[in-house]
């Protein structure tokens, strides 16, 4: 990193050099603004290299004096990031108190912060889900509740994976993210984390996601992991419970709104996933040869079809051949809300005849994770029987009209 002083059109500018390439130079000026100039119009008066401070990283840190023990497992994402205002770069939070910072939480709980990984959520893979699940299992020996801080973009995938892998839970596992980094005045980090920690202190025996209820502060809701989805790119209330009400809400205390599984006496982890599963998003113009390439070597494929669960008729033979080979094709809907029903139209009935399985009202991403879990732990022989069972509340007995829970 370099401090520089330049002259541009008779004006001196001091700051930190961010980038110098392709005929341009970008500086983080002393006033905090990023300024980019044509390199040919700039005279550099001085360059001074400054040594970057190395941030101390500790795998486990403990805070608080409360009786209830809660573990926070950090995996990365916006919630665990801050902006370095010297350079404009995004860096990991060095002080875990920025995530939950508040004397009230520290007086109520004994909080352990465990750094598991530092990954942007889009870079996480099924192997990371397994690694995280095993770390959670280890941490249950120390705490009565688990919070996982995670990037929001793929949080529904990871949380669903842990929901399926934990056959039994003796304490809650609450995933939490944020839409704005912890150093920003508009950050939702602390409120989301406060809600997550309080949800983790209940008798819940499930995996959930804690995020804002609305765009304003004041209320955090808990979504069942296997019924939730990120439905907005940037709003604080980006997550929704699909076709159902959320599990609980936190303002100053926790209030449950629907039935939930209670914590059991012990944990049971089934940590095998078959990674040879993929998702195909049907669209007009999708050709058979492309589908064949996408599903080659796969053991199962989740199809995001139109409406009640349809694809173009000329693609049906591809999936018929796929299922004939002992593989599994699963139909979900791009509509997200509502349920697949392949018995209504002729295309659906042809898909059934081709061996395509209906996922019913399962969220597509959840069906994808469930297929990986089912193949990994039960194999092909038991796949249809297990996949069609309601394992963690991912299948609804009835759909609730959307206007009821928005």
From Swiss-Prot:
In terms of Gene3D superfamilies, this protein maps to: 2.30.30.520, 3.40.50.40, L-asparaginase, N-terminal domain
Q: Which organism is this protein's natural source?
A: Thermoplasma volcanium (strain ATCC 51530 / DSM 4299 / JCM 9571 / NBRC 15438 / GSS1)
Question: Does the entry feature the keyword Secreted, yes or no?
Answer: no
EC top class, in one word?
Answer: ligase
Q: Matching SUPFAM superfamilies, A to Z?
A: GatD N-terminal domain-like (SSF141300), Glutaminase/Asparaginase (SSF53774)
Q: Which residues form a coiled coil?
A: none
Protein name per its UniProtKB record: Glutamyl-tRNA(Gln) amidotransferase subunit D
Function of the protein: Allows the formation of correctly charged Gln-tRNA(Gln) through the transamidation of misacylated Glu-tRNA(Gln) in organisms which lack glutaminyl-tRNA synthetase. The reaction takes place in the presence of glutamine and ATP through an activated gamma-phospho-Glu-tRNA(Gln). The GatDE system is specific for glutamate and does not act on aspartate.
Q: What is its EC number?
A: 6.3.5.-
Q: Which residues form the Asparaginase/glutaminase domain?
A: 68-390
Q: Which GO terms describe its biological process?
A: amino acid metabolic process; regulation of translational fidelity; translation
The active site lies at 78, 152-153, 230
How does the annotation summarize its subunit structure? Heterodimer of GatD and GatE.
Q: Catalysed reaction(s)?
A: L-glutamyl-tRNA(Gln) + L-glutamine + ATP + H2O = L-glutaminyl-tRNA(Gln) + L-glutamate + ADP + phosphate + H(+)
State the family named in the UniProt similarity comment for this chain: Belongs to the asparaginase 1 family. GatD subfamily.
Q: Which Pfam families match?
A: Asparaginase (PF00710), Asparaginase_C (PF17763)
Return one GO MF term: asparaginase activity
In terms of NCBIfam families, this protein maps to: asnASE_I (TIGR00519), gatD_arch (TIGR02153), PRK04183.1 (NF003217)
Which keywords are on file for this protein? ATP-binding, Ligase, Nucleotide-binding, Protein biosynthesis
């Amino acid at each position: 990193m370099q401090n520089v002083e330049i002259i541009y059109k008779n004006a001196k500018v001091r700051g930190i050099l961010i980038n110098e390439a392709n005929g341009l130079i970008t500086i983080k000026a002393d006033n905090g603004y990023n300024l980019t100039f044509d390199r040919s119009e700039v005279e550099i008066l001085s360059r001074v290299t400054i040594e970057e401070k190395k941030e101390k990283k500790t795998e486990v840190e403990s805070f608080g004096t409360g009786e209830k023990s809660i573990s926070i497992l950090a995996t990365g994402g916006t919630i665990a990031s801050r902006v370095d205002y010297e350079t404009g770069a995004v860096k990991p939070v060095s002080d875990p108190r920025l995530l939950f910072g508040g004397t009230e939480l520290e007086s109520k709980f004994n909080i352990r912060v465990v750094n598991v990984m530092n990954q942007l959520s889009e870079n996480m893979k099924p192997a990371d889900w397994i690694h995280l699940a095993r770390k959670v299992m280890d941490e249950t020996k120390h705490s009565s509740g688990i919070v996982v801080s995670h990037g929001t973009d793929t949080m529904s995938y990871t949380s669903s994976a842990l929901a399926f892998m934990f056959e039994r839970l003796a304490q809650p596992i609450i995933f939490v993210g944020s839409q704005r980094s912890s150093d920003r005045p508009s950050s939702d980090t602390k409120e989301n984390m406060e809600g997550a920690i309080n949800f983790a202190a209940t008798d819940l025996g499930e995996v959930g996601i804690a995020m804002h209820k609305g765009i304003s502060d004041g209320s955090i809701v808990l979504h069942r992991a296997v019924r939730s989805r990120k439905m907005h790119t940037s709003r604080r209330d980006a997550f929704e419970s699909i076709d159902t009400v959320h599990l609980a809400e936190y303002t100053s205390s926790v209030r449950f709104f629907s039935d939930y599984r209670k914590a059991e006496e012990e944990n049971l982890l089934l940590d095998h996933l078959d990674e040879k599963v993929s998702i195909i998003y049907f669209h007009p113009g999708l050709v058979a040869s492309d589908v064949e390439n996408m599903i080659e070597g796969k053991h199962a494929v989740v199809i995001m079809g139109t409406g009640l669960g349809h694809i173009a008729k000329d693609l049906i033979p591809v999936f018929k051949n796929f299922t004939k080979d002992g593989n599994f094709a699963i139909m979900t809907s791009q509509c997200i809300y509502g349920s697949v029903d392949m018995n209504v139209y002729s295309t659906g009935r042809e898909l059934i005849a081709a061996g395509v399985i209906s996922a019913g009202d399962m969220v597509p991403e959840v069906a994808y994770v469930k297929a990986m879990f089912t193949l990994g732990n039960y194999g092909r022989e038991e796949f249809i029987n297990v996949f069609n069972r309601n394992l963690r509340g991912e299948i609804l007995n009835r759909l609730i009209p959307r206007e009821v829970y928005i």
